[in-house]
């Protein structure tokens, strides 16, 4: 068994003073206050988690022509797998790990109406098979982005209504096949319809076996998505919402139980659908009661700066503990990995970050980083 001590320990649910953390193998065996053995660190937190990124797809030190966030061959690629394009030799992974961001959800970009499957990964793994933890939904995009890439191949929309017409048509076709399949099963005769690879994914969405992770910034695009939710019964997570500047949108999402992965903060409002982007919009988010997490959208902002963006949540009134929970416990819950990550508790992975001081102080940095029980980074 190994142990460390923390003058201050953020568990992801509470703050403990003079605490001890113990683990055996990759699992925590005890977390609590009291005397213990092992090195003493000023502050210890759970491993940080980025809930939405393109790390390993748009890679540090490589030309843009080699980026793989968006496949250009068609606007509907539900059966694409983001894991097939992630390259673990991206220098961004090392920088993230050194900053305490050990886990990330990687998604296809937002140029396509549906871009493919996501992957929750270990940033410190040597290859993508070892990196993969689980899937966290199929990437889709509403709003400006799918209509902004008209020069790409395939059927490309020129308007929002064109993009959603393509998606609606595909979902209708698969829903009709599901009805045919049910009729054949009920009668016990006839031939059940066959599903293509793309239709198999859409079928899983209609059956709520898969979540749809939807890029959307503006309130009216959120409204359009909610119409789809009502029409097709989809299970969705809303990504971004940086242009939403009213409380009603978030209150409706809260009432419907639809979570938001907010961000990225600290980036240029580089398009019209971000004209109302402002960190002060966070007040609407945090006061609404909606379940939310936080992203970097790496490389839109670098993943290693994830914790720095929490300062805006402090500005709107959150405590340091509550802010840290966004990129630990809350992100883990949205991604479906809260059984092993997000909080420091007995039975969970021994993945944590030991800091030189208060993580919110500019001079502080990780001095030791543990991933599933192993020391993977240490500063001299």
Language model: regions and residue ranges:
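His/Asp/Glu-enriched, well-ordered alpha-helical/loop segment
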Residues: 60-61, 67-73, 77, 254, ...
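N-terminal metal-binding scaffold of metallo-dependent hydrolase/deaminase domains
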Residues: 1-35, 42-44
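C-terminal cap of metal-dependent C-N hydrolases
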Residues: 4-11, 333, 345-380
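Active-site gating loops and adjacent loop-to-helix segments of metal-dependent hydrolytic enzymes
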Residues: 59-86, 127, 141-149, 191-195, ...
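Active-site core of metal-dependent hydrolases
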Residues: 82, 178-278, 333-335, 356, ...
